[in-house]
Amino acid sequence: MEIFDKKGRLLFPDTERHRKMAAEKGILAQGKKILISQVFCSNGHPLVRPENPKFDQEPGIHLICEGNTFWQSVFLSPFQGDRQKQHKTDFKMGEILQIYCPECHVHFPKFAPHDCLPEAMYLALFLDQEANYYNTVCICNVWGCYSSFLRLAGEIFSEVRAQKSAR
């Protein structure tokens, strides 16, 4: 995205245009909360369905999480930054999980490393059915991680860049 026009003048963002583009991708503002209303696996299967358990009257994001000893359905809050989830049994704190689509069982692709554990990764969940990495939200694959909530891909790029420059 350009920040200057051809004559060198600063371009100001068209916030209404950005809001419309975000809404098309299922990102909606609800007061001070940001709702992610649609998420897909890399094969285009929807993870948010009306029958999913609700968080503040909005359906959660359905994932299958597999640890060392068992697997289960986990429903994440669809609100960015909200750590709530619904599940039957806790995994061991700090356990690395395999996370995949409940419909086709494809694993979510690795997006970027995370610093909570040496082998921790952010996994990409897509905001469109085309599996475009520019339109993703991410989750950490470590159970109980302090960042185990939805993060926008742009935030993760900034975080990784800051970590590398601090080294």
What would you call each of these model-derived segments?
Residues M1-S37, K54-W71, L76-F91, L152-R167:
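Short, intrinsically disordered terminal segments enriched in charged and Pro/Gly residues
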Residues K20-G26, Q84-Q86, P118-N132:
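A cross-kingdom feature marking solvent-exposed beta-strand/loop segments within repeated
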